[in-house]
């Protein structure tokens, strides 16, 4: 991915206040991007099919259309100086078609890599970074051969699409394999997929790295807890061996330089019981596990993303205070709102979504603390998240 100056052949060295940033996707990530950009003086446009979506509520204008509507993407580009996106399932070809109208400093190479799990794994491995063992599979026959090599337990994922556990099948035994056989086409084929071996991890973690196409900085490594395949809680910083932390920062910088990163990249990690760092997935955008940075860091992930795509300089972010971030899903809206008056320490973020649904991310709460373990216990003791209690 080029810097903004390279993307525009020197026409724009850096984006200045008053310029317009067009965001593809109008959910909470786009909303928080837009809020950061507005503080810096930028105008905001958004493309989203839902009128008055969360991003549109804080934007200057909205193009209301589907994400793959090339005419709508062109309209957004014509009204913008720079394009960015809040999720990775964006039509990369469509972005390439409008780059003469608006710069796309993130480029499309990173999009194409992260849209295909096989390409993603290859890129990560080619840059000297370990992943779980994996094999590309397109049929039951190929799956059986891959299982002979990787063994149970393993997880079968579609090569593209899927989030929060969607498009995934856990294989623990022959009985699970039989279910895949039953769903396959008559010739044994199924959607292009990847089989990944299970990692015996101590905990899940993530690290954010930001770049402007030339310079790169990393945020603290955080510990993540998922429940029902959805991120539940992030603890910053993660308590871990300094050598392991250094390795994680180095691999993040290595991947960022490999992409010539402009904007932010989230790297989901497994930290194994023998202190190895394994990369799970990449996300070429701000990440749920980085929301704590809004209160806890010298500048947050959304600031870093906007500065990166605008060609502004980047300073190494500092953790000002440890923090715990917990997601507020649809079923948690009522109980958390009922307790807001009792918890002045809660930094409450509501995404202003029109429809409240079970398991839908509606907001988050961040607590700054000197004792993350106590804060975790205090949050759980409220009972707001009892439906997500560990089995």
Q: What residues fall within each predicted segment?
A:
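Phosphate-binding core of ATP-grasp and ATP-grasp-like enzymes
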Residues: 184-240, 246-279, 283-291, 307-316, ...
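Active-site nucleotide/adenylate-binding loops and adjacent lid/helix of ATP-dependent enzymes
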Residues: 2, 113-206, 210-228, 232-255
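ATP-binding N-terminal substructure of ATP-dependent carboxylate-amine bond-forming enzymes
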Residues: 1-122, 126, 141
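Short, flexible turn/loop "capping" segments at secondary-structure junctions
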Residues: 55-56, 159-161, 356-360
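Peripheral (often C-terminal) accessory segments that flank ATP-dependent C-N-forming ligase machineries
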Residues: 3-9, 307-391
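A conserved FAD-binding loop/helix module that cradles the flavin
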Residues: 293-295
